[in-house]
């Protein structure tokens, strides 16, 4: 059994990203922690999961945990996602540390105390924050640009295993994250300036993607595994013009995508009825607060 320590600021989004990466569901869930079967290094490729590893002991009794770990050598970290267990966690930490050898040279041991349960596990992976930070430092960016962390989450939510197409490519966030994840990346934009900027950003990281100028409502792409994108929703469109753009794009998307459509928009818009009218059936929405003037909604849509 493996464990995933989730982002407490958006637990449901983290949990959904985990399910998408493992193409399945968690076996058990405690506040802030999911227990699952599959790849124990899931956190490395995630945008919202803090760390993952192999569970060694799961119990409400600290004695069980101590017996499972006794005599081993670890560098110990403790997490207490629920405040009411902080004092109990100190006791757990003390008993565990006194029964093992501790050294920073040894493997990381995560002790997580939540809902009265103690989860002890060997950490196998952490979120790759270095690449996320690196991808934020690119030649071209602009106001409202999707940040790499959200872009990575979106690509993972698509469950794509081969390719991703972004028909509103902008400065290339989705393509950059798709390529980092090892996927074939295709992008287009109606604005030639955005094509130039996205290509420059891709070259900056030595990433190769197929990028071309096209209207998202009439794309030359015929079929793609997953459609992941950040359509416009700013002041450049009137409310009527924006609604028409999205409606036409949704109808085009039903023809293009074999798997999932994942897109972001301002949370104040509700596109569920328009998506269903276009032929999509399943709609899941996650909200992410960014700053006082913008909260994004991530739509995960299936046919």
Question: Where are the regions a protein language model picked out?
Answer:
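Class I S-adenosyl-L-methionine-dependent methyltransferase catalytic core
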Residues: 1-64, 102-108, 113-303
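A short N-terminal interaction module
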Residues: 68-118
